[in-house]
Amino acid sequence: VTVRATDDANNTSTADASHSTLGSSLQLRVKERVAPVLAIIYPTASALITNNKPSITWTVTDDDSGVNPSTIGVTIDSGSKITGDSISKTAISGGYKCTYTPGTALADGSHTIKVDASDYDGNAASQKSVTFKIDTVPPTLSVTSPADGFVTNQAACNVQGTTNDLTSSPVSVTVKLNNGNAEAATVASNGSWSKTITLVEGTNTITVVATDSAGKSTTVTRTVKLDTKAPVIKSVTLTPNPVDTEKTVVISVEVTD
């Protein structure tokens, strides 16, 4: 803005933004209408995470009037909006990178976070939100067959049981025999699973691992013995021999297996 003053004697004075004392008062700023831009970095939408105190991270930028840091906020689920010093703000080009870590652990299950901010001209950014899941509990796993310590003469062994995870299903199950490779079991929609393996002669160690979608796992082991060799009768002794009628006779048998 330029101001010109002229008196009756036709003397003229001019003042504009370059004036040494009045310059700042002659600067007219027009408010901008472009809102800040928000972007959530972590967690991502539909993420499945095992940390129940996740570091929620997002950015807010505004290249015009600038981001007003006092308006930066985050809301978790239906809780109150969190603002102020609870949110860490690191200056970046045109705005801030923000981080908030909950002081109280979030429960397992689904959560929604919402972030918002405004610029110095009062333009509010379009709120951004993401929904994610937290899973800190490994899946349940039971092996119903075979029992630990089971002895059999059949090489084919059907390993079976049940598994479940309320937060991050489906659950995958693998079965490993001794030092062999872990092989996938068939898991039904109700959580029951089974896998047929071939035992080797002697003591076998069966390792079953259930892993949920969050990568948490539960392990159960069973020891099973395969014995296909019949016992050997090495000797039989009858004492006394011969024996009188209606008398007691002792039969001694030596057997190895």
PLM-predicted stretches and their roles:
Residues 7, 18-39, 128-139, 222-231:
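Flexible, low-complexity linkers/stalks enriched in Thr/Pro that connect modular domains
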Residues 46-52, 148-155, 241-247:
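Short, solvent-exposed loop/linker segments at the N-terminal edge
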Residues 62-76, 164-177, 257:
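Solvent-exposed loop/turn segments flanking beta-strands in beta-repeat/beta-sandwich domains
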Residues 96-100, 191-195:
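Short strand-edge motifs at loop-to-beta-strand transitions and within beta-strands
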Residues 103-110, 196-203:
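Surface-exposed, short loops/turns at beta-strand junctions within beta-sandwich domains
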